[in-house]
A protein has these predicted regions:
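A residue-level detector for the "anchor" residue at the start of short, highly conserved motifs
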Residues: 1-177
């Protein structure tokens, strides 16, 4: 079990060589050794994962309300239990997502799968916009201020409020270290 403190990030290499970067406030459950014919972990939070390929042992990432099956790929998962929306952004390879409504959805590189309740949408994104936290920065490109403040609030575990009279969008980089 890995629990990442607020204001911190962590990196772990699993017994099969799979590498995981975990963001602040993330809980990651994984075995010391993978048994049987599958490799399975559970995440409540945000990770970037680079899965070591093994066609004979699929890799499964479970969250509170979706499952992700891969053979060898790299992708981001944002699935904090408290958030209404969960997302997956695929960097390389292919993954199959078991959505909460029972459907299985295959996504490709540069696809983002977003799920709220029993609804989901898949759209194209720039993957570079999603993983800056693992390198100690938060990068934003035309992002609503409310989204930026939500990420900062989660990272540092503090409540941030502002007057939302009109939407404000921002671009830039924030150093987390």
């Amino acid at each position: 079990k890995l629990v990442v403190s607020y204001g911190k990030r962590a990196h772990v290499t699993l017994c099969d060589g799979t590498k995981i970067w975990a963001n602040a406030g993330t809980v990651l459950l994984f075995p010391t050794r993978f048994e049987d014919k599958k490799r399975e972990i559970y995440v409540d939070g945000e990770i970037y994962i680079d899965v070591t390929p093994n066609p004979e042992k699929p890799f499964i990432v479970k969250t509170s309300d979706m499952g992700i099956k891969v053979l060898g790929t790299s992708f981001y998962v944002s699935a904090y239990r408290k958030d209404a929306e969960k997302s997956i952004v695929l960097v390389t390879g292919k993954v199959e997502v078991a959505a909460s409504n029972g459907e299985t959805v295959r996504i490709l590189p540069n696809d983002r799968f977003r799920q709220s309740a029993d609804r989901y949408v898949v759209d194209k994104v720039n993957v570079e916009d999603y993983g800056s936290w693992k390198d100690g920065q938060l990068s934003f490109r035309n992002t609503e201020l409310s989204g930026i403040l939500k990420q900062l609030s989660r990272y540092y575990n503090v409540k941030i409020v502002y007057d939302k009279q009109r939407p404000i969008t921002c671009s830039g980089k924030l150093n987390l270290d």
